[in-house]
């Protein structure tokens, strides 16, 4: 959780200026106090995410429903809004089940074109929405046959945009996913849409500088000269991924590490720390 309004806005890819005044009035600390005062104890995870101690979303739903019904609000579901009309400083909300008159409306549109058009008719200028929080479609020999392989911490760069994000990473059937990918897709949502989701990324699977990785490899080579490269546990990656790295580098996993050439070592380092891959599209996560 973050309790400083200005710092909090820095975590939002868009709308930080507009959110500052909102967070000055009501921020995560207020939200936590609101729930805990209504008998929903909360906990802060290591990554700063906040969850109910119960680990059940029903705890949150129950608290909010009880509060709304206690204040005599009505909750109407399965009702589709067909039109909103400005009427004498009020809003007439038209539905098939009847009309509602309101002085204030909060409309959570999502990306539904129909909803956006209704808001636009009320005089609001709409900015064309683009997808955010998506995964990358990639076809690369290094990822082939490895869906489900995860990395505790990796770094993804988009060199052409001079941007990077780090965090857990997951190989999927269609490419790459996980927090590192989702974060960079959120921050660069508009630019990636302009690129039609065709761009190059550079991945550091072990999230340490290539010079440090080189030192670790050379030290291991000196200390374990007779060990086969395929059985050498040097970095925090799975055995399957390590052997896939050797495969794309055309290195026999049975080869003694003492016999690994400088060229082969460099190929391993490039695959681990500076792997370039072409993104060819996006998918939902």
What would you call each of these model-derived segments?
Residues 75-79, 95, 128-130:
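Short loop/edge segments at beta-strand edges and connector loops
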Residues 3-7, 13, 24, 30-48, ...:
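Residue-level recognition of phosphate/Mg2+-coordinating polar/acidic sites
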């Amino acid at each position: 959780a973050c309790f400083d309004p200005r710092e909090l806005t820095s975590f939002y890819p868009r709308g930080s200026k507009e959110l500052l005044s909102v967070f000055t009035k009501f921020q995560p600390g207020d939200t936590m106090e609101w729930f805990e005062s209504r008998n929903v104890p909360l906990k802060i995870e290591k990554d700063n995410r906040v969850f109910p101690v119960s680990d059940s979303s029903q705890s949150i739903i129950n608290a909010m429903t009880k509060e709304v019904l206690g204040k005599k609000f009505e909750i109407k579901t399965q009702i589709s809004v067909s039109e909103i009309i400005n009427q004498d400083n009020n809003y007439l909300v038209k539905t098939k089940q009847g009309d509602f008159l309101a002085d204030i409306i909060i409309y959570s549109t999502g990306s539904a074109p129909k909803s956006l058009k209704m808001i636009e008719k009320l005089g609001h200028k709409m900015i064309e929405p683009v997808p955010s929080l998506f995964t990358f479609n990639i076809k690369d020999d290094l990822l082939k046959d490895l869906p489900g392989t995860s990395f505790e911490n990796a770094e993804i760069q988009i060199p052409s945009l001079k941007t990077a994000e780090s965090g857990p990473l997951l190989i999927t059937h269609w490419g790459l996913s996980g927090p590192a990918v989702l974060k960079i897709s959120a921050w660069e949502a508009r630019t990636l849409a302009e690129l039609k989701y065709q761009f190059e990324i550079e991945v550091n699977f072990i999230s340490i500088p290539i010079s440090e990785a080189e030192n670790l490899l050379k030290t291991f080579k000196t200390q374990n000269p007779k060990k086969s490269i395929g059985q050498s546990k040097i970095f925090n990656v799975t055995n399957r991924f390590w052997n896939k790295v050797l495969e794309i580098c055309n290195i026999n996993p049975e080869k003694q590490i003492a016999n690994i050439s400088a060229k082969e070592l460099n190929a391993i380092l490039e695959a681990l720390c500076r792997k370039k891959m072409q993104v060819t599209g996006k998918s939902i996560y």
